[in-house]
UniProtKB/Swiss-Prot annotation:
Assembly and oligomerization: Homodimer.
Enzymatic class: oxidoreductase
Keyword Calcium: no
Protein name: Superoxide dismutase [Cu-Zn]
Location in or out of the cell: Cytoplasm
Record-listed E.C. numbers: 1.15.1.1
Length: 158
């Protein structure tokens, strides 16, 4: 049984549509779409704990982390389920997303349905921060402010 989900991201100047598809429980999830209005460069991209945007993106809570691990990069074994690394916005402020992730699940007990997808202002350091940035790096990747977010919702097959 395959699953299709969507997140419509909104922020003050940033917007986008992200689609999720998973063929069966335990298989990788494909994450694709486009986000506009970003500053050129790298931006942290994460699934957050709550599907709550009542107080903007801050209501989304911390990164989705059902296994209580430290923050890491998308290819690290030690990472939050929600750690999707960085997306890249071009000179026009548009980021094209095409990710396949084995940790993000649409089916099963740790589904991301109803949780929030957040894009951040800054580059995610992937848990590799040093010195006075190390503690925050292991929680958030020092990715900065939340510039847009949306709730992962059920969508029609596409």
């Amino acid at each position: 049984m395959s699953a299709n989900r969507i997140a419509v991201l909104r922020g003050d100047n940033v917007s986008g549509i992200i689609r999720f598809k998973q063929e069966k429980e335990g298989s990788p999830t494909t994450i694709s779409g486009e986000i506009k209005g970003l500053t050129p460069g790298l931006h942290g991209f994460h699934v957050h704990q709550y599907g709550d945007t009542t107080n903007g993106c801050i209501s989304a809570g911390p990164h989705f982390n059902p296994y209580n691990k430290t923050h890491g990069g998308p290819t690290d074994e030690m990472r939050h389920v929600g750690d999707l690394g960085n997306i890249v916005a071009g000179a026009d402020g548009t980021a094209h997303i095409d990710i396949s992730d084995k940790h993000v699940q649409l089916l099963g007990p740790n589904s991301i349905i109803g949780r929030s997808l957040v894009v951040h202002a800054d580059q995610d350091d992937l848990g590799k921060g040093v010195g006075d940035k190390k503690d925050e790096s292991l929680k958030t990747g020092n990715a900065g402010a939340r510039v847009a977010c949306g709730i992962v919702a059920v969508s029609a097959a596409s």
